[in-house]
């Protein structure tokens, strides 16, 4: 690996066999750079969590290789575990213990020296704004508070790499924002963060680079901005109206100013390379046929638009999800 790389995957594949064969990860190769927040984005069943399980040494790949720092995950799993922290999708906090005791218990499992551990616990509680709730049972915490505590617990031993599997799933918008702030704080300590999510806004807000996965395959990898620049459609113009003249739509199409038009009920969504430059001409067409507009908005493509362009469907459509083998299936 190069000096700037901290994770490298080479043709990684994972196949589960039970009553049927499922290729959860299919010939995936990429690298992760030191200190970045790297996003794995895709629908349920895309292979994100399976990939994380391989990188954290919970399961072995069927074929291919994966390196975490300088360690190959199947040959030196103990060295890998010593330098990573993992926050799984499903909570593993003991809700009957206090916030402090949850961190203390985990630190003892990691054999952190007692004096160092106490200082570190208070440091992390302060980071999460939970100092005044240190002696409160976790059962009394909101979903956002629990998630923040679980994330910093994985960070207790100052790992080089932090794996966060769907860190905000099931949280309300305010709690999601709190967790986003927490993740950003952790990244300022130069920790590399691997984030799996199916929330487009989360990946776009947090990640330096985003890898799109679908049906076990890597379909695109770049920065959020470069992903959006690669779209042929350009800007999106939404125009609302109460009534329409049948001549408006053909006139816009024949103008040569736009790349596509999507008809909706009482609105058009128009794609153009430069929305601001073509908007006056489009408005002129509406005015020519005496059609009043009720709303006009221009916005740049989103990460969701990128996913739709790459796969032909929305992320939450559920199409293309891979069934997971019952009971985990037989790995090969």
Name the predicted role of every residue range.
Residues 104, 108, 115-133:
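Conserved ABC ATPase "signature" region
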Residues 43-47:
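Walker A (P-loop) phosphate-binding loop of ABC-type ATPase nucleotide-binding domains
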Residues 2-6, 14-27, 77:
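A short, flexible loop at the N-terminus of ABC-type nucleotide-binding domains that lies
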């Amino acid at each position: 690996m190069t000096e700037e790389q901290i994770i490298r995957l080479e043709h990684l594949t994972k196949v589960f066999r039970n009553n049927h064969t499922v290729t959860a990860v299919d010939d995936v190769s990429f690298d992760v750079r030191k200190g970045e927040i790297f996003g794995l984005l895709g629908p349920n069943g895309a292979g994100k969590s399976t990939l994380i399980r391989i990188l954290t040494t919970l399961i072995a790949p069927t074929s291919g290789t994966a390196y975490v720092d300088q360690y190959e995950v199947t040959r030196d799993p103990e060295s890998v575990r010593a330098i990573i922290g993992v926050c799984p999708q499903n909570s593993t906090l003991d809700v009957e213990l206090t916030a402090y005791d949850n961190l203390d218990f985990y630190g003892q499992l990691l054999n952190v020296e007692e004096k160092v551990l106490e200082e570190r616990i208070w440091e992390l509680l302060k980071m999460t704004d939970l100092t005044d709730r240190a002696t409160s049972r976790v059962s009394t915490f909101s979903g956002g508070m629990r998630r923040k505590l679980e994330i910093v617990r994985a960070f207790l031993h100052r790992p080089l790499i932090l794996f966060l599997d769907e860190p905000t799933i099931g949280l309300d918008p305010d709690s999601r924002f709190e967790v986003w702030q927490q993740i950003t704080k952790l990244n300022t300590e130069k920790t590399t963060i691997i984030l799996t999510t199916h929330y487009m806004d989360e990946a776009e807000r947090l990640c330096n680079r985003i890898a799109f996965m679908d049906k076990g395959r890597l379909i695109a990898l770049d920065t959020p901005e470069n992903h959006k620049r690669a779209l042929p459609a350009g800007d999106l113009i939404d125009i609302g109206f109460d009534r329409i003249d049948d001549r408006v739509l053909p006139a816009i199409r024949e103008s040569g100013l736009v790349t596509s038009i999507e008809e909706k009920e009482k609105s058009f969504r128009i794609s153009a390379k430069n929305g601001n430059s073509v908007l006056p001409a489009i408005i002129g067409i509406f005015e020519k046929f005496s059609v009043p507009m009720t709303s006009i908005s221009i916005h740049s493509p989103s990460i969701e638009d990128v996913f739709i362009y790459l796969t032909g469907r929305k992320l939450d459509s559920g199409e293309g999800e891979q069934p997971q083998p019952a009971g985990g299936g037989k790995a090969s």
